[in-house]
Amino acid sequence: MRKSMGITVFGCEQDEANAFRTLSPDFHIIPTLISDAISADNAKLAAGNQCISVGHKSEVSEATILALRKVGVKYISTRSIGCNHIDTTAAERMGISVGTVAYSPDSVADYALMLMLMAIRGAKSTIHAVAQQNFRLDCVRGKELRDMTVGVIGTGHIGQAVVKRLRGFGCRVLAYDNSRKIEADYVQLDELLKNSDIVTLHVPLCADTRHLIGQRQIGEMKQGAFLINTGRGALVDTGSLVEALGSGKLGGAALDVLEGEDQFVYTDCSQKVLDHPFLSQLLRMPNVIITPHTAYYTERVLRDTTEKTIRNCLNFERSLQHE
């Protein structure tokens, strides 16, 4: 009989816990499920397991990594595509490997298309009016994608999936990326901004892309253009965005991510007063759609992320056996 391997899963939400419990027997693993995010204080809960899993909102600092090393952890698998939340330099220095999971880009691509359609059809205003039993057509006349040019910034897996979907709508598609990864009409960023009716962001956040869309870039965009962001909040200078929306320079925005969202995303804040410089303004704007960083979140992605996390840990354990 194969010996079961243990994995300590930190920051484990109820739906993730159910997925781990369902899949664990198939892989002969024993998960220790902990709802609290990983920290230097609770790292000791991983004692006895060489592999742990963390969520993408868990900040894994140097102090936390040191605490993990002390209890014998050798591998951190984050349940996310990126690992900006982990001090990978400290992990490498302490001999702890870090792994990520890649999931299907379709969930985010579908969501980005949904947000585009909602934005250009004025869905927020329409839904609000109907909720008030106002069924008039005042100010609800929308636009059609086939009549528009869409600029896709970033043509990695998600950007490529977005381009593929847009072609089905018959609209013109422009693309910008540091490398040409697909057959597409690639242009420089300033040309994309000047010629796109919709701009959608699909690049990772790093020093070079922080505030990629700032005051100057917004100034280059077409009058009445729409901005869609399902990437990372800090890709956009939110202050400049709010100013452009208020002045009418931009026709609208649909944001699944927002700069400074860490204080409220994935939390019921209905009874709280949030100290965010722009959230309340954006929520009041009839042409702005805000959603809670949920573009990726589907049943398929939950299962895929859980399964790939388990496989990452199993593969790491096997690699140790062959050293």
From Swiss-Prot:
The active site is at 232, 261, 293 (proton donor). NAD(+) binds at residues 157-158, 230-232, 256, 293-296. One of its GO terms (biological process) is cell wall organization. Induction: By vancomycin, mediated by VanS/VanR. It is an enzyme of class 1 (oxidoreductase). Coiled coil: none annotated. It comes from the Bacteria. The keyword NAD applies. Keywords: Antibiotic resistance, Cell wall biogenesis/degradation, NAD, Oxidoreductase. The keyword Oxidoreductase applies. Gene3D superfamilies: NAD(P)-binding Rossmann-like Domain (3.40.50.720). Pfam families: 2-Hacid_dh (PF00389), 2-Hacid_dh_C (PF02826). InterPro entries: D-isomer_2_OHA_DH_cat_dom, D-isomer_DH_CS, D-isomer_DH_CS1, D-isomer_DH_NAD-bd, NAD(P)-bd_dom_sf. One of its GO terms (molecular function) is D-lactate dehydrogenase activity. Its EC number is 1.1.1.-. Required for high-level resistance to glycopeptides antibiotics. Catalyzes the reduction of 2-keto acids to 2-D-hydroxy acids that give rise to peptidoglycan precursors that terminate in the depsipeptide D-alanine-2-lactate rather than the dipeptide D-alanine-D-alanine thus preventing vancomycin binding. Belongs to the D-isomer specific 2-hydroxyacid dehydrogenase family. This is D-specific alpha-keto acid dehydrogenase. It comes from Enterococcus faecalis (strain ATCC 700802 / V583).
